[in-house]
Amino acid sequence: MNSANLTLEQAILRFGRDKRDGRRVVFTNGCFDLLHPGHLRGFELARELGDVLIVGLNSDASVRQLKGPGRPVIPERERAEILAALESVDAVIIFDELTPRQVISRLLPDVLVKGGDWPGDQIVGREEVEAAGGRVVSVPLVPDYSTSAILQKIREGFGPSGVNKKPQPEGARATRPES
């Protein structure tokens, strides 16, 4: 199935049929700003839990409220396009709220997946999914991968001017393109 960016209503229509046909719908969500291998492995694990993987994506406005000024680094449409291009992802739904509760309560996936950094009792949508007969699964985090850590590394290595502050190895020199 080709991945698509859908509205919540489109996803309910499209994947409601899949559920009626016995296909298991899996849902996960996040900001997914600066996608890294930890995210990819999480999507792959989530996809293995069912037949269809839908990713809820925080809008730019909700990311700013959650993460602060300067975020997201990648605009929502571009983040959605990147996610939709992944083989493991069947659809992407952008949502404006701070949490995906409304999306989850309307979509009612068979499986709700979150990263292992979320305590089980704090996973938004848990009650709705379990009340509808679904289950909630925490997937393990991949060590050494974090968007916040990547951003910190960038900040430490580059000053406000964008020039690399780290010393260059001896003998290295910057080159300029010819005019």
Q: What spans do the regions from the language model cover?
A:
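Nucleotidyltransferase catalytic core that binds NTPs
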Residues: 1-179
